[in-house]
A protein has these predicted regions:
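Phosphate/oxyanion-binding active-site loops and adjacent basic polyanion-contact surfaces
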Residues: 1, 17, 59-67, 91-95, ...
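Short helix-terminating capping/connector loops at secondary-structure junctions
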Residues: 2-3, 29-31, 78, 108-114
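Hydrophobic targeting segments
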Residues: 4-8
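Residue-level signal for short, function-critical loop segments
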Residues: 10-12, 88
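Active-site-proximal specificity loops/subdomain of glycosyltransferases
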Residues: 12-79
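Conserved catalytic core of nucleotide-sugar-dependent glycosyltransferases
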Residues: 81, 90-165
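A short, conserved alpha-helix in the catalytic core of glycosyltransferases
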Residues: 157-161, 169-182
Length: 182
C-alpha cells in the first residue's frame, strides 16, 4: 500500500497564502499538514559567516532552517521514499507518479538506492561528461553528479549521508548545495 504524507514547512507566509495551500491540500486524498517554522529552533546551529566570508543573511538563515526542519521530519517520519521540493517548482500532473516508477525501475536495474532529480538544469549541459540514460515510466533520466535542493531519495540514503545533508543547514557553502555534490 502506498502512503503519501505531504508536509509543508512554512515560514512567514501570508494567511491568505496558507489558506489557499490548505484549500488545495484538502482537495487531495493525501495525509497532509502545514508546519510553522520556528527559527529559534535552528538559529544557534547555523554558522554566522559563510564560505565567502560574509555574514549569513536572515533570508538564508530561514532557508537553511527550513531545510533542516524538512530533513528532520523526513528522518523521523519517512518509511521509504522522501521528496524534497522547493517552493518555486511547477510539476506536470503525472510528475510524482513518474518519479516513483522511475525510482523503482532504475533502483532495480542498478541494484542500489538513488537520488532522483526531477529537473534537468540547462547549466549541467555546459560541460562534456559521459553519462548513462535510463528509461523511467514515460520519461528518460540521465546520471548527473550535482543537484539543487529538489530531489527524491530513500530514507536509507538520508540516514547514510545524514551529516552531509545536515551540513547544508549549518554552514552556507558555495554553492549552497555543495554537500549534495560530494
Amino acid at each position: 500500500q502506498i502512503e503519501f504524507d505531504v508536509v509543508i514547512v512554512d515560514y512567514n507566509s501570508k494567511k491568505s497564502d496558507l489558506d489557499q495551500m490548505q484549500k488545495q491540500l484538502n482537495k487531495s486524498y493525501f495525509k497532509h499538514s502545514i508546519i510553522s517554522l520556528n527559527l529559534n529552533e535552528f538559529k544557534d546551529k547555523i554558522k554566522k559567516v559563510n564560505a565567502e566570508n560574509k555574514n549569513v543573511t536572515e533570508n538564508q538563515i530561514s532557508n537553511m532552517s527550513n531545510i533542516h526542519k524538512s530533513l528532520l521530519i523526513a528522518k523521523n517520519q519517512c518509511k521509504d521514499l522522501v521528496y524534497f521540493v522547493e517552493d518555486d517548482y511547477l510539476h506536470h500532473q503525472e510528475a510524482v507518479r513518474e518519479m516513483i516508477l522511475a525510482y523503482e525501475r532504475i533502483a532495480s536495474q542498478t541494484n542500489r538506492e538513488l537520488v532522483l532529480c526531477p529537473t534537468d538544469y540547462p547549466y549541467l549541459y555546459t560541460k562534456i561528461d559521459s553519462t548513462n540514460i535510463f528509461l523511467g515510466s514515460t520519461k528518460h533520466w540521465r546520471v548527473i553528479d550535482e543537484t539543487l535542493c529538489t530531489f527524491l531519495t530513500s530514507i536509507n540514503i538520508l540516514q547514510k549521508h545524514w551529516d552531509k545533508f545536515i551540513s547544508m543547514c549549518q554552514f552556507e557553502h558555495l554553492p549552497f548545495d555543495q554537500p549534495l555534490h560530494d
